[in-house]
Amino acid sequence: MIIEPKVREYICTTAHPQGCAESVRNQADYACKQGMVNGTKKALIIGCSTGYGLASRICALENCGADTLGIMFERQANGRRTATPGCYNTAEFHRLAAEKGAYAKTVNGDAFSKEIKDKAIELIKKDLGKVDLVVYSLAAPRRTDSEGKIWSSCLKTTGEAFTEKSLDLRNNEIAEKTVEPATEEEVLSTVKVMGGEDWADWIDALKAADVLTENAVTVAYSYIGPELTYPIYYHGTIGTAKQHLQKTMSEINQAHPDVCAVISVNKGLVTQASAAIPVVPLYFAILYKVMKKAGNHENCIQQIARLFTQKLYTPTGFRTDENGFIRMDDYELTPEIQEEVKKCWKAVTTDTVKEYCDIDGYWEDFYHMFGFRYEDIDYTQDVDADIEIDGVVM
């Protein structure tokens, strides 16, 4: 079929296999150029098929030469429908790993479930013995817990209603947006989905099965952002969940003294999830413009390659702040960058969006997530959307 992008609201419902493969190759090429470090040898990447999880898997391979087991929850092609981008990304990653003689298998299923945890443990025992790194990089709208209860996350404040400028990405217009406060049940539900409970469940299960090496490292990803976005993000339902994740880090370290749990606080980037959060897309679009002008903007792979080579695996150990977090948002939150962002925020209107916002860069990142807008790909060509992925366990 000829595959074109079909965007509805904030989601692209198609993905291009050749474009996704190009994306993975580009990321691998960049990571490879950053050099090798004495890091992970056998890694489990939970949420391995897109974004930070995919970048982590690529860096484990390219910067550490690691064997990797991944967990994803993706839909394969079905007749007239393409697969989700994570399927195509994973197919290309498996191919790259095979080229390097590295082990790569991926379990496709719900990472929140006991069944997938059991399957991962079975594969680790059979193929890897033990893992020394566990990356937790899940982003999901809902979670079914061990008792069968379904929890759903929401994007709301936790105090009063909040009104602020927002960017409508459908028409590039600036308008005020009001976000209503969440109920206690909605806050709890968001914490259940996006907090640290499942991260702890994974580490408990892996530890009980004796598939973690001594002094194994586990990394979870978080975002804090600037005060500008606190009401909707860090002081909102998502931020409450992220604070629970931070609390979980301490609990894992206390419960398992021979496991080192750490949180990497990352910079703001375009994702499918972030596009739907009120206020945040405008902040990101301004941030992109300001940081690119300053010369310190990082995309996903640039950030995770720096994490692996300069912060996580160093001769002197982790580089953390006073809270024990690895700060990959260090460039974003410098006073100079934030001061410039605030100036642009105050000045931007619908008429001056392109002057103050990197709209083109925002959309380029968005389309790249789905394998579109790569110069080397001929999108007029007929391609097979249904591809076989060696090494995927359903």
Please give the residue ranges for each predicted region.
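Class I SAM-dependent methyltransferase Rossmann-like catalytic core
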Residues: 1-36, 186-188
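Canonical Rossmann dinucleotide-binding motif of NAD(H)/NADP(H)-dependent dehydrogenases/reductases
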Residues: 29, 34-73, 77
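Catalytic loop of short-chain dehydrogenase/reductase
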Residues: 152-258, 265-288, 292
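C-terminal helical subdomain
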Residues: 251, 259-264, 281-392
